[in-house]
Amino acid sequence: MFRQNNIVLIGNSVVEQSKSIAHLNKKVINIDSFNDRDLKGENYKNSDPYGLVNDDVISILQSLELAKEDTLILVSSGYDSSNDFYEQLKKFGMIISNSYKSISDIQNNSNLIAKLKSNNIKIPEIFSLEQSKKEEKVIIKNSSSSGGFGIKIFNKNLNQDTLENYEYCQKFIKGQTYSVLFISNKDKKFEIVGVNKIFNKKTLHTNFCFSGAESNIKLNKKQIQYLESVIEFFISEYELIGLNGIDFIISKDIYFLEINPRITQTCFLYNNSFEHGFVKAHIDVFLNKDLPSIKDTGNTSVAFETLFSNTKFIFNHCLLEYDFISNIPKVNTSINVGDPICTVNITSEDGKKVNKLLSDNISLIKNKLTNIEII
C-alpha cells in the first residue's frame, strides 16, 4: 500500500473512481463538476462543466491545506488553457496522471495526424472545407475535446470563418465504435485490460455524445495485434503511463478515432479485474515499475448507459434504493436539456444477456422518472 493518505480526484464524473478507492481507508477529496449524491469522500463543486483544472480547483486545494508529500492528485479531465494549471497543481501533491506535455502534444492535431499516417495507423480521411462540400457525409471534429463533444454533422453551407482553429473535417465512417483500455508503466510495457463496445446518442450538445459501453468484447487475433501496435506507438511517442483508452471504429478496416490519455469513464467496467480496484492499479504503476495482474473475468460483461434529459426540470427523486444506478444528482438539482440525469449499470455472467438486462433496468428507471422526456 502506498504511504500517501490524501487522494484528490479531479474530473467531471468521478463517482466510480471514488467508489473504487473507498475501501483503502484514505482521505478522498472529490473536485467534480457534477458533485453527485453518490460520491464517496469529501466533495467540492467545480464550476467548469468539463471538470477542467482551473482557478476553482486551485482555490479549493489552497483552502484544504493538505500536506504536499502526503497527497496524490488524479486528473481525469484536463486543464483550462487560461493559465499553467499543471505547474500550479504540482504545488499541492504528486500528479498521478499523464504529463501536460504529453496531453498537449496529443492535442496538436496536425502533428498527430502526420505521425499516425507515417506509422501506418489508419484514420478516416481528412478534408479541407471545400473538399468536404463535395463529399456525401462529413463530420466536424474538435481536437481539444473527447467523448463526442464538439462533433457536428457537416453542413455544405458553411464558410471558412465558421470553423474554429481547433476544428477539422473528417469523413464519416459507418461501423461500430469500440474502445480498448490499456495500462502501461514507466518502462513502456503494457497490458490490454479490455475492449468495449461504445454507445452514443444525439443530444442538444452533440450528434455523437458518448453515453455508455459494454465490456469484455472479443476481437480476433489479427485485430488485437493491430491494436497492440497502435498502443505501442502512443506509449513510445507520448510516454503514456497508467490507464488510458483508444477509441476506434471497425468498418472494413480498423480506423483510429481518438486517444484518451487518462482514466476514462469505461475504466470502472474492469474494477473487479484488479485486486484492489482500477484506481489503485492506476496509482501503483506511477509509484512502482510493475504492471498489476489482471484477473480473467471469463464471460462476465459489465455495461452502462447514461440517461440524458430532453426536458428542463428540477430533480426531486431518490434513486439511492437502486444498486444499479450511479451518478445520482442531489435533490433540487436543476437539470437542463441535454444534461445527464443518471447512469444505469448491469453485470452479467452471461455476456449474451447483458444488453437485455440493461434495457430492463433502463425501462424501470424511465417508469420511475415520469413526466420527463429521456434520451
State what each model feature region is.
Residues 174-177, 181-233, 237-239, 260-286, ...:
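ATP-dependent carboxylate/phosphate-activation module, predominantly the ATP-grasp catalytic core
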Residues 280-375:
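Peripheral (often C-terminal) accessory segments that flank ATP-dependent C-N-forming ligase machineries
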Residues 91-158:
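A conserved helix-loop-beta module that forms one wall/lid of the active-site cleft
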Residues 7, 139-141, 182, 253-263:
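A short beta-strand motif that forms the metal-chelation/ATP-contact edge
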Residues 184-190, 250-253, 287, 310, ...:
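Short acidic-glycine loop/turn motifs at beta-strand connectors
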Residues 121-124, 139-140, 149-179, 204-214, ...:
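Conserved ATP-binding module of the ATP-grasp superfamily
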Residues 1-101, 359-360, 370-373:
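ATP-binding N-terminal substructure of ATP-dependent carboxylate-amine bond-forming enzymes
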Residues 240-252, 294:
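A short glycine-rich, hydrophobically flanked beta-strand micro-motif that places a catalytic Asp/Glu
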